[in-house]
C-alpha cells in the first residue's frame, strides 16, 4: 500500500445530489496537486474512490450512505442465461484499445447517447468541452475501448487499467442498437479482459439501492460491496 496518510483531501460544500433529488451531497477529492499515480489510484479504489477527469473522489455525505462502491471479483463470476445471450448477440463485434482523444466520431456517438438516455441528467446537454474534460485525459493507464460492428463504432468503454483491476469509468453507446444491450455487454467484456490480464476485479463505481439506473450493477454475481470499509460479497 502507498502511504495514504500523507495524502491531502478536500471536501466540497453540500450540493444537490445527482442521484437522489431529496438529498444533499458532499464529495471528498484527492488534492489535485497530487500527481495521478496509478498505485495511489489503485489503493484509493480499494477505499471506494473513483476517477472523473483529472480528479479522484468519493462521496463524503454527512447524513447519507446510499452510494455503495461495487466491484466484480472476476475469477468467481459466472454469467447467467441472459448474460450468455448478450455475449452471443454481440459475438460479431470487434474490440480495440485506443488512446483517449477527441474525435467527431466519438463525440457524435456520445451526443446521441446522452440525448437519448440521459436527457434528464446533469450531463445534458452534451458539449465538446464537457466530453473532453470528463473523458479525454492524457493518462498512461486510461483507454478508450472501441466496439465496432463491420467497422461502425457502436460503443466506447472508457476504462482505467490498474494493478488490482479494471475501473469502468464510463461507457457510451449507440442508443439505436437497443437489442444488443451494449452497456451490459461492455461490462461482460471488461470482466473477460480483466481475466485475460489476470487482474482481480472490475470496479463499477457506486450502487444506490433506491436509484433505478443503478440496478443493473447487482445483476453481475457475485458482486462485492464496500460496507463499513470492508468488501462484502453479495451472492
Swiss-Prot record:
Q: Which InterPro entries match?
A: Acyl_CoA_acyltransferase (IPR016181), Asp_Glu_LeuTrfase (IPR017138), N-end_Aminoacyl_Trfase (IPR030700), N-end_Aminoacyl_Trfase_C (IPR007472), N-end_Aminoacyl_Trfase_N (IPR007471)
Which positions make up the signal peptide?
Answer: none
Q: What's an example Gene Ontology biological process for this entry? A: ubiquitin-dependent protein catabolic process via the N-end rule pathway
Quickly give the catalysed reaction.
N-terminal L-glutamyl-[protein] + L-leucyl-tRNA(Leu) = N-terminal L-leucyl-L-glutamyl-[protein] + tRNA(Leu) + H(+); N-terminal L-aspartyl-[protein] + L-leucyl-tRNA(Leu) = N-terminal L-leucyl-L-aspartyl-[protein] + tRNA(Leu) + H(+)
Any idea of its EC number? Answer: 2.3.2.29
UniProtKB keywords: Acyltransferase, Cytoplasm, Transferase
User: Keyword Phosphoprotein, does the record have it?
Assistant: no
Q: Name one GO cellular component term.
A: cytoplasm
Q: A Pfam family in this protein?
A: ATE_N
Q: Which domain of life is it from?
A: Bacteria
Q: Where in the cell is it found?
A: Cytoplasm
Molecular function (GO) terms listed?
arginyl-tRNA--protein transferase activity; leucyl-tRNA--protein transferase activity
Cross-referenced NCBIfam families:
PRK01305.1-1, PRK01305.1-3, PRK01305.2-2, PRK01305.2-3
Tell me which HAMAP family the record gives.
Bpt
- Give the function comment from the record: Functions in the N-end rule pathway of protein degradation where it conjugates Leu from its aminoacyl-tRNA to the N-termini of proteins containing an N-terminal aspartate or glutamate.
Q: Which family does it belong to?
A: Belongs to the R-transferase family. Bpt subfamily.
Q: What is this protein called?
A: Aspartate/glutamate leucyltransferase
Q: Which organism is it from?
A: Pseudomonas fluorescens (strain SBW25)
